[in-house]
Each structure stands twice: as C-alpha cells, then as structure tokens.
UniProtKB/Swiss-Prot annotation:
Keywords: ATP-binding, Cell membrane, Membrane, Nucleotide-binding, Repeat, Translocase, Transport. Probably part of an ABC transporter complex. Responsible for energy coupling to the transport system. Residues 298-310, 322-332 have a biased composition (Basic and acidic residues). It comes from the Archaea. GO terms for biological process: transmembrane transport. It is found in: Cell membrane. Residues 10-250, 338-566 form the ABC transporter domain. It comes from Methanosarcina acetivorans (strain ATCC 35395 / DSM 2834 / JCM 12185 / C2A). Its EC number is 7.-.-.-. PROSITE patterns: ABC_TRANSPORTER_1, ABC_TRANSPORTER_2. ATP 2 binds at G371, T372, N373, G374, S375, G376, K377, S378. One of its GO terms (cellular component) is plasma membrane. This is Putative ABC transporter ATP-binding protein MA_0870.
Length: 641
C-alpha cells in the first residue's frame, strides 16, 4: 500500500461490532485517530475490547470473523471494509496475543521468511530481511531451530520478527511481551521504539503491564466496556489516576507510591521517584542493595558468580546458590510432597533443557519459579505434571514416581494449567469446562464445585459463553477454574497472570493463597512473586541458581542479572532510603513511622532546649524576652508556648 500524503494513519469513527452468536456488542461507538509516527499504548480491563479493536485494523474483522459491523475504519486513508486483506496486511503488521495462533512453520527461518516470500522478493533479499529481523529481536542464533522447541517468550520474539521482516507502516501488537523476561521485554521495546523514531512506523500496542510500557509510549488510551474512556499524553495520563484505580489497572509502583504519600507526581522509575521524594539524583546508588538484618553479610555485595552448593547467610534465613546438581543425593525429606533427584529432561535427546535439577517442595508451600526465557521453567512444570519423560533422574510426587505411563493415578491430585489456555479448552461453554473434571461425582457436588471454581476466577457471569469467544485473560481463568473444580492437592500454573488486569490478578492470587494446599507457578512478574510466593526459585540455563525467600533472593543483584531479572522499583527505592521493604504498603508504613519519630524527636529536643534556656542566656544572646513572647515562640519566662 503506497503511503498517502498527510499524517493520519488510523482513523476510526463510530465503530460498533458484535461477534457472531452474541447479542451484546464488543465495540460500542469507538472513535480514535492516530497520527503517523505515534506510539500509542492501549490498555483496559480484561475483556474490554482491546484485542477486537486491533483485529479491525487489517480486516480480520469483519472480512474473516463475520458478525455485525458498522462505522468506519480508515488505514492510511483506505477504508478497510472496502479493501482486501492482502492490501491491508502489507500496511498493518499484526502481532497476535497468542503466538501459537500465528506461528505455522516448523522452523524459525521459514516462519520469518514467509512474509517476504509472499512479496515475491529474490532469495538474497529474503535472506537479508530474515537475518536483520532475527537480529533485531535477539533470535539470530535460533534461526535454524524448530519453532516447537521455543519457549513462549521466544515465540513472541519470532512473531515480532515476522512482522519486522515486512517493515509495515503500522505495527499493531497485542500483548507482545507478556511471556518475556524483563530484560527481553526492554530489548524488544527499545527496538520497537527505535523503529518508531527513525522510520516513523506507527505503533499501537495493547498491554496490561503499564510499568514496563509507559516510558516508551507517547500516548495512553484506556478502554472499558467496548468504549474509549481516556485518551491522554503519557505525561498527563496519571492526572486521572482514579480512572486506573476504578478499572483495576496496575499503576507503576513509583506513581502509586507518590500518590499514596499524597504527592501529586507521576515518576515512572525509581530514580525519578527518589528525585520527587527529595533524595536527589540516585541513578547509581539506587542499584546498590542492602541487607538490613545483617549488614556484614549482604547478599547484594556478592560480585562473583554463585558457586554450586554455596549457602549465604542473609540475616533472616539461608539462600542456596548454584546449580545444585550434586547435593541432596540421600533420601528425600519426609515432609516433601514433591521430590526431584538429578533431573535431566528435554524435547530432543541431544539437547537437554533441564540439567541435573534437585528440588524438594513441602506441602503448603507457594513456590514461584523465575528466570530468563528458555531457562527451563515450563519444562520443569511439565515434568511435575508427568507430561514429559525424564531422560535421567527421578520425579516423585506424594512419595511415588510420576511418569507419563502412570500419570492417570495422579490426575485428580495434581492440577496443571498450560501457558496457552487454548490447549485445555474444548467444551461449548465455560460451565461445561468447569464440570468436565468432576463429572463422575454426585450432581450436588458437581454443582457446588462448578460454582465455587467459577466464582473464584470471577467468571460466573460468563458460564454460558463459548470459551473461544472470550478474551485471553478470561480463557486463562476458565482453564484455571476447570482445574480448581477437581480440587487437586497440588496446583501447577504456567504464567497464570498473563493477560490479567490488577483486580483479577489480586483476586486469583489471593484465592490461591487462602485455599490452595501447595502451589507451584512460573512467572516473569517479580512483583507477583514477591507478594504471593513463600519461596522463590531462580533458573538459568536449565539449572536452579537461587532458592530462598523472595525478599532475600531479590537483594542479590548478580543472581537477578544472570537470570535477566530486575528489582521492582519499590525495592530499589527502599534500598536507597535504607528501608527493608518489598511492597508499597511496607515502604509507606516505614516512612510514615520514621516521619513521626523525627517529628517527636524534634519536639522533645526543642522542649528540652527551651526549658534549659534561662533569661540571662537569652539576654546574653541579644534576644529580648518580650520580642520572643510577641513572636509566639516562648513566653516571658522563656518557655515555649
């Protein structure tokens, strides 16, 4: 599509859309204009219509979806309803929310080459575009890999590379970094921002993780109930913080901290927050972690790579560092509900993903697993769920070996939710999905479990809906509900907060905290891990490199760096201020207490100094008593009024 003169790239007027089989419109009178070169962040509660809006830009809606469509959408001056998808697709690159919906080639190279091949380019130019696109997303070394062997985050990178190889005028991305580690997220967003600035590619990006996106976007658009309810420049968006709170959106920690303290400012980083709080320019100092329980043995002072089997005392507990391949070879702990010994596992015999894992998990623990994309987190969960056969070593659950051949005996006791919920949904309604697990129970018990699980995931009002018609976040909660209904003793979750807004994340994780016996979950969201896990495992290259309490592991910068993780902003701020806090609530409580203590000490010191100050001393100082009395500071006796 040849670029038209003028700067309006997307113009939407009074857009209404209703999916086939539904009576309630998903989009309700949307009006939106985006100019050439803008970077627009589109956010809103789960199920508000964000993904649907993106699909209208390249003609998937209404050309492929059907349904009832009205209104006008112009892309670079071209009316989408009157254009064919081939023409639209050359102008609009769409990255889907679920990478598995987009990837169809068996190799990374073929997937990225598909677009340029359809433009009938010569082989040399295609190779050049593939190489450059993979380099931009950090996947050049995976060019010949099978797409089936990639992690979720790596698949997202490949989908982005496929679009970059086409160099569209508009790049529309639906939660493109939701499965990436923090470092990978920044790398991809920096690449996208560079293309946006240098080539004036227009960006429309849907995301819930505002703390990672706000600093890249020029403009923030919020949807709710199929309508746009806020459209502001990034610099002014949090002037309307009540809208974010009302809709259950996650506000970046520095912004939330300032507003909680009554400071009208919207810093997007720890450094900016400290400047607002009067701590000056702290770009370097804020990165220095401190251990306030035992300063002599701070984990943050470690500069050497973690050695195998090394224990570091952190004052309030022990954290183990290293790959732990050779320890704990004896009998498993009697309290362990899960016991792993020297586990080697992978998808190809000559390419192991897990490399000598040893792990004990006790009943009642909530264990978060973090690490870089491809580090083995999902593979570890698949072994715990008996969906992968170990190449070497053993996995024991409830004291018995768990392997694919006898996994049926654990089916009702271990519940597993895939990273991609669509792999689990096959019924005609949400209600049927929740009923499927306990279908052999008595009718009354089935009813009770179904209702309880749907309520726990806040989808009771969607019970008659077709799962495939829901948003990704709603589909994920449906998959979780289908597992909760069998009432398992162990729940395994792979990225359970993907596609969820703040309210649904808190509701889900609080339910697990209060009702689940044992929980093991993978996540890239370090804030969630810190708040809801009793124990944090960090993985890198198929090995566990740290294992301990989250508030202790988080202080080790070297470990975090090795696993492509970063400290949450509130922890960075607390470190600089000399406060041991991992949440806004903790930090505010400490700062408030310190402020009160300072005021009390100042008052007591002033009282003492005033009472000790005699009239003669006042006279000697050249200050007249009557003048002090007139000032209201002290009375004629030299005592503070």
């Amino acid at each position: 599509m040849r670029k038209k003169e003028g700067r309006t790239m997307i113009e939407i007027k009074d857009l209404w859309y209703t999916y086939p089989g539904r009576t309630e419109p998903t989009l309700k009178g949307v009006n939106l204009k985006i100019e050439e070169g803008e970077f627009v962040l589109l956010t809103g509660p789960t199920g508000c219509g964000k993904s649907t809006l993106l699909k209208t830009l390249n003609g998937i809606i209404p050309h492929e979806s059907g349904g009832v469509f009205s209104g006008s959408i112009r892309v670079n001056g071209i009316e989408t309803r009157n254009s064919n998808q081939m023409e639209l697709s050359s102008a609009v690159g769409l990255v889907f929310q679920n990478p598995d919906d987009q990837i169809f080639s068996t190799s990374v190279e073929d997937e990225v080459a598909f677009g340029p091949e359809n433009l009938c380019l010569d082989r040399e130019e295609i190779d050049k575009k593939v190489e450059e696109a993979l380099r931009m997303v950090g996947m050049a070394e995976h060019r010949l890999d099978s797409t089936n062997a990639l992690s979720g985050g790596q698949k997202q990178r490949i989908c982005i590379a496929s679009m970059l190889a086409m160099m569209p005028e508009i790049l529309a991305m639906d939660e493109p970094v939701s499965q990436m580690d923090p470092l990978g997220t920044r790398e991809i967003l920096n690449t996208v921002r560079e293309l946006n600035r240098e080539l004036k590619i227009t960006i429309l990006l849907v995301e819930h993780r505002l703390h990672e996106l706000m600093s890249f976007a020029d403009r923030v658009v919020i949807m709710d109930g199929g309508k746009i309810v806020l459209d502001q420049p990034t610099s002014k968006a949090f002037d309307y913080i009540e809208v974010f709170h009302r809709l259950g959106l996650r506000v970046p920690e520095p912004v939330e901290l300032c507003h909680t303290l009554g400071i009208k400012a919207s810093p997007l980083s720890a450094e900016e927050a400290l400047a607002v709080l009067g701590a000056g320019n702290c770009k370097e100092k804020v990165k220095t972690p401190r251990n306030f329980s035992n300063p002599e043995e701070e984990t943050g002072r470690r500069t050497d790579p973690a050695e195998r089997n090394e224990f570091v005392n952190t004052g309030s507990g022990n954290i183990k560092y290293g790959d732990n391949r050779s320890e704990n070879k004896g009998s498993e702990n009697r309290d362990s509900i899960i016991s792993i010994r020297d586990l080697w596992s992978g998808y190809e015999k000559n390419r192991m993903v897990l490399k000598g894992i040893n792990l004990e998990i006790r009943k009642g623990e909530r264990v978060a697993i973090m690490g870089t994309n491809g580090s083995g987190k999902s593979t570890l969960l698949l072994n715990l769920a008996a969906m992968l056969k170990p190449y070497k070593g053993s996995v024991k659950v409830f004291g018995g070996d768990i392997q694919p051949r006898n996994s049926y005996s654990f089916a009702g006791r271990v519940g597993f939710v895939f990273q991609n919920p669509d792999l689990m949904l096959f019924c005609d309604s949400v209600d049927e999905e929740a009923r499927f697990g306990p279908f052999q129970l008595k009718y009354k018990d089935i009813e009770e479990r179904t209702k309880t699980s749907l309520e726990a995931m806040s989808i009771l009002d969607l019970r008659q809906d077709l799962p495939q018609s829901l948003s990704r976040g709603q589909r994920l909660r449906t998959a979780v509900a289908s597992v909760l209904s069998i009432d398992p003793e162990i729940i395994l979750l792979d990225e359970p907060t993907t596609g969820q807004d703040r309210v649904n994340i808190e509701h889900m994780m609080n339910y697990f905290k209060d009702n689940c016996s044992t929980l093991v979950f993978c996540t890239h969201d370090i804030e969630i891990a810190m708040l809801y896990a009793t124990r944090l495992l960090v993985m890198d290259d198929g090995r566990i490199i740290a294992d301990g309490k989250g508030r202790e592991v988080i202080k080790n910068i070297e470990i975090l760096k090795q696993a492509s993780l970063t400290q949450p902003p509130v922890v960075e701020i607390a470190n600089y201020l000399g406060v041991d806090a991992i949440s806004i609530t903790e930090l505010v409580e400490v700062l408030t207490r310190r402020s009160s203590e300072v005021k009390k000490d100042d008052g007591e010191n002033y009282e003492r100094m005033s009472s000790e100050l005699t009239n003669s001393e006042l006279a000697d100082s050249g200050v007249v008593n009557s003048e002090l009395a007139d000032s209201g500071v002290v009375n004629s006796e030299g005592i503070k009024c």
